[in-house]
A protein has these predicted regions:
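Alpha-helical transmembrane segments and immediately membrane-proximal extracytoplasmic
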Residues: 1-408
Length: 408
């Protein structure tokens, strides 16, 4: 078989595997959520936020203690008994070394289990890593060279993201902007192929799901002025969040002391959730409130502070997980609260639109992928194209501010 044919066959298979991984992990997470919090058994759709709110305070705390046990003992066991873990970004530097399959799969499954139990981190790293683990095995068996294997692993990472969020174009940009940093014709074609394939396969099992249903996404001149004003605020806040998060965990994950620490910190998260149930899970609950205009500025600011706090607690406990949706929640709650202040003194504009552009700007700065973040939020919300202008204005101000603060 020709070398080029091997690569494109591997990319197609990776897209298929990415879609299947997305289905399996999403269903697993939903099963854990429904079982742990006791909702959704009577039929009909109930969101995680609604399910948690309906659950007693005692049950929330007990579930989070169980989550702490899984975090502490789970990652201690992986670090203690498994082969050394290799992150995808590190694997791209030495692609032929590959990813340790069992370690990576165990690591991904544990992320989904803990997020399902209420860990305040994101779920998106798990399908990315698991898909990349399968791609690593496939690339090795097909005898792909270093450059082709690097492309395959990067595309596998994007395929996992596309599958769980139903965002084929944003995942294509993620591969090019965040993973590879190149925009060759081959890379663009490969990224599109795997992302679209993974999304199509995932839709067979999960449906063509719109992740958020925002209300009143109106665009007017005041929103453009607000976008210019809020961008630097979001850029600076995203930098501060990154700097606060990188200090954790306190202990190495192979230190047995991390187990009681994780249990204690997650018990504290459970106690906090008695008053702020929206902080549990990856942050989608908070975004649903701000995007839908279902909260006020006071609670929005409180959610900002509390979500920031519990994310740091989870990281200090040694938990792994993504930060796409948590960072979106921080950006959306900040912008939603700021919009309320704006509307008090200036011509009114849509607070929901403000929340959407805030989520994108915070995400774009924090994960250093501004183009991906803009398209990501559009695909998640089905927002109108008219929102592109305020999105770009906010993102520009946020990115420039972050660079001025030394965040490259």
């Amino acid at each position: 078989m020709k070398h080029t044919h091997k690569l494109w066959i591997a990319l197609i298979l990776t897209g298929i595997v990415g879609g299947m991984v997305g289905i399996a992990l999403t269903e697993l997470m939903h099963f854990i959520q429904h079982t742990a919090y006791g909702y959704g058994t009577g039929g009909g759709h109930v969101s995680f936020r609604e399910g948690v709110v309906q659950t007693s305070s005692e049950r929330r705390i007990l579930v989070l203690i169980l989550c702490g046990v899984a975090v502490g003992f789970g990652w201690w066991s992986i670090k203690r008994f498994s082969r050394p873990q290799i992150e995808i970004k590190a694997a791209l530097k030495q692609p032929l070394q590959g990813l340790p399959f069992l370690t990576t799969v165990s690591h991904a499954l544990l992320q989904i289990i803990t997020v399902g139990l209420g860990s305040p981190l994101g779920r998106e790293v798990a399908p990315r890593e698991m898909t990349a683990a399968f791609a690593s095995v496939g690339g090795r068996r097909l005898g792909l060279d270093e450059d082709d294997t690097r492309l395959l692993l990067a595309c596998a990472s994007g395929a996992g993201l596309a599958a769980v969020y139903n965002v084929p174009l944003a995942s294509t940009l993620f591969i090019l902007e965040a993973m590879l940093g190149i925009w060759t014709q081959q890379a663009v074609a490969a990224a599109l192929l795997t992302s679209v394939t993974a999304t199509a396969v995932a839709r067979i099992g999960l449906g063509d799901v719109q992740q958020y249903h925002p209300a009143h996404l109106d665009v007017n001149i005041p929103l453009l002025w607000f976008a210019a004003a809020i961008g630097p605020v979001l850029g600076a806040t995203a930098v501060w969040f990154q700097r606060s998060a990188k200090k954790f965990p306190f202990l190495k994950r192979n230190d047995p002391k991390i187990i009681p620490l994780a249990i204690a910190l997650f018990a504290l998260i459970g106690i906090v959730s008695v008053w702020f149930p929206e902080i549990l899970g990856n942050g989608k609950a908070g975004n649903q409130l701000t995007f839908g205009g279902m909260t006020d500025w006071r609670y929005s600011l409180e959610m900002t502070a509390v979500k920031w706090f519990v994310v740091l607690l989870a990281l200090a406990a040694g938990a792994y997980g993504g930060l796409i949706t948590p960072s979106m929640m921080l950006g959306s709650t900040i912008a939603f609260a700021a919009a309320a202040a704006w509307n008090t003194f200036f011509t009114a504009m849509s607070s929901e639109s403000a929340a959407v552009i805030g989520a994108a700007a915070f995400l774009g700065v924090y994960l250093k992928m501004p183009l991906t973040a803009i398209v990501f939020i559009l695909e998640l919300t089905y927002a109108p194209a008219a929102l592109l202008m305020p999105l770009c204005i906010t993102m520009a101000g946020a990115v420039v501010t972050a660079r001025k603060m030394g965040f490259e």
